[in-house]
Amino acid sequence: MANLHTPDGEIKKVFPINEDTFSLQELQSFVDGYIEKIVLPVDKCSMIINEEGKKEKLPYNKFATQILLKNYPKSEDYIVGNAIICANSDLA
C-alpha cells in the first residue's frame, strides 16, 4: 500500500495490482509519466514523482514538497504533480 498525494491536497491509498509490489507501469500511471525515485532517509521510505513534471509545468505539490524538505532541509527543490509515498519494499 502507498499514499498518492495530489497537488490539490487529496491523499488516496493505492495498492499494487499483484498485492505485492508496484510495477513500473503502475507507478508511471500514478504520476502520469516517467518516474523519479527520491529516497526519504528520515521517513525510511521513498517518494515517486514525475521525472519531467517541472518541464511539463505540472502544478506545485505543497504536501510532497514539505515531506522532501523534512528529509533534505537544505534542499531548494520542490515537487510538482502527483507524488507517491511508499515503503521501499513496495517497489519492484
Residue ranges of model-derived segments:
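Domain-length accessory/inserted modules outside core catalytic folds
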Residues: 1-92
